[in-house]
Amino acid sequence: MKTFTATPADIEKKWILIDAEGVVLGRLATIVANILRGKNKPTFTPHMDMGDNVIVINADKVQMTGNKRADKRYYWHTGHPGGVKFRTAEQVLEGAHPERVVLKAVERMISRNSLGRQQMTNLRVYAGAEHPHEAQQPTVLDVKSLNPKNTRSA
């Protein structure tokens, strides 16, 4: 029997809504990355964008285990000598764009090539509970009920 390989006509993209409130960051990012890649589908083909569109709301209320909220650092370089800078996860979550913590966690779980960049365009992350994608009628995925370890009280 020949191995099934999907064609562009076989790809069917759905919209999935995930509420990140009280969910552990790494576990959320793993679930989202697998959905974006399409690994949850029986027709998964590694070299094609098979994944669904994912909407993550309440990204500012995501949880971290241990001391990661205070100790985890996000580094960047200004391009000047001695220009390495960083912010802690706590500073990012309390700043102007707290959704970037979830974006960066998922981005680092997706392959770093043109296919990965294409898959990341199917992810929308919002800090609050509101999102402008009601017209797409997203199906709700309750990450908290999948595994008791997925959630953590503040």
From Swiss-Prot:
One of its GO terms (molecular function) is structural constituent of ribosome. Keywords: Ribonucleoprotein, Ribosomal protein. GO terms for biological process: negative regulation of translation; translation. Pfam families: Ribosomal_L13. GO terms for cellular component: cytosolic large ribosomal subunit. Belongs to the universal ribosomal protein uL13 family. This protein is one of the early assembly proteins of the 50S ribosomal subunit, although it is not seen to bind rRNA by itself. It is important during the early stages of 50S assembly. Part of the 50S ribosomal subunit. This is Large ribosomal subunit protein uL13. It comes from Cereibacter sphaeroides (strain ATCC 17023 / DSM 158 / JCM 6121 / CCUG 31486 / LMG 2827 / NBRC 12203 / NCIMB 8253 / ATH 2.4.1.) (Rhodobacter sphaeroides).
